[in-house]
Amino acid sequence: MADLPAKQTALTFQDDGTLGISHDAPVAELKPDMIIVKTAAVSVNPVDTKMESGFAKAGSIGGCDFAGTVVAVGAAVRRPVKVGDRVTGAVMGSDPNDPSSGSFATYVSAPADITLTLPESVPWAVGTSLSTVWFTVGQALFHHLLPDLAVTPSSPYAGDKPITVLVYGGSTSVGTAAIQLLKLAGLRPVTTCSPRNFDLVKSYGAEEAYDYRSPTCAADIKAATKSNLKYALDCITTKDSIAICYAALGRAGGRYTALDPYWEATAATRKTVKANWTLGITMLGKDIAWPAPYGRPGSEDARAFGAKWAAELQALLESGKMRPHPLRAKEGASWEDVLAGLKEVKEGKVSGEKLVFVF
């Protein structure tokens, strides 16, 4: 095990609530069930830009996604991982309860059983893009939206009648992952996006693509599915997206899962639709001290699903079945580059690609 410094360079929240570079951020202590990773790459997610108001406290490290080399392994770790292994994972950045948690740092502490071992053939840039997205989408689909089907990529649907699932926002990074996972689970994904991205989403496995701006979008989906659509995953979660999802679901109702809190007023318009939303970091099992409706006690159920899902993802990764979203990678990156990338995402200047930074 490498000797770890007490302090490190990281992106931490300043007194004004913005992220800035700190050269004396704390390095997390090695806990029994954790590993410590020397960061080789990070990626930027939209959630990373939403922590500046009431979420993190000054000194907390930001960021979720990381990839790097294991430098320390906790005494209680049972997963086969060792110093020198290449791994990727996601942590809870911007954590008021644990300021040393966060991926935008030289060293990252992560739960061993919710990390993935990267094959040598997978570059750092690709590896860091596979964490938050694929964990969150797995939870959304197989823990919240489709539990009644009891399907996963390792146990796909085997029925004679195809089952269609709507992915609203298929050209996002979570959307392309959802389309792939649904296809691997033996289901039939259809999606919404801009017409310029129709070819993109179909290349990931979407059976049909619909223009979300079309005034007949929901009606077109409903007609194509013969009013039998039962499942909708909302990767955008706006008032318009939930309205289209609800209107597209069949006359008998169904299930709707969002990736953010949804509009209760719209959800109340159809009592036959069971609505919920997913919060990927619950899979870490930690108490979440963020404002409502995000804050909540740690969930053993979500933690158990996270560990089980990590094993599922590891198998997909090793078999080459996880295709990343289109990436814009910066090699030889600095923390200043990451700050610039966060600004781009916050200003809505990134579309159809994911920003990753390799150090």
UniProtKB/Swiss-Prot annotation:
SMART domains: PKS_ER. Its EC number is 1.-.-.-. Pathway: Secondary metabolite biosynthesis. The keyword NADP applies. Keywords: NADP, Nucleotide-binding, Oxidoreductase. It comes from the Eukaryota. Monomer. Trans-enoyl reductase; part of the gene cluster that mediates the biosynthesis of macrophasetins, 3-decalinoyltetramic acids (DTAs) which feature a tetramate (pyrrolidine-2,4-dione) unit connected to a decalin fragment and that have potent bioactivities. The PKS-NRPS mpsA together with its associated enoylreductase partner mpsG incorporate one unit of acetyl-CoA, seven units of malonyl-CoA, and one unit of L-alanine to assemble the linear tetramic acid intermediate corresponding to the backbone of macrophasetins. PANTHER family: HYPOTHETICAL OXIDOREDUCTASE (EUROFUNG), TRANS-ENOYL REDUCTASE STHE. Belongs to the zinc-containing alcohol dehydrogenase family. This is Trans-enoyl reductase mpsG. The lineage of its organism: Eukaryota, Fungi, Dikarya, Ascomycota, Pezizomycotina. The gene is mpsG.
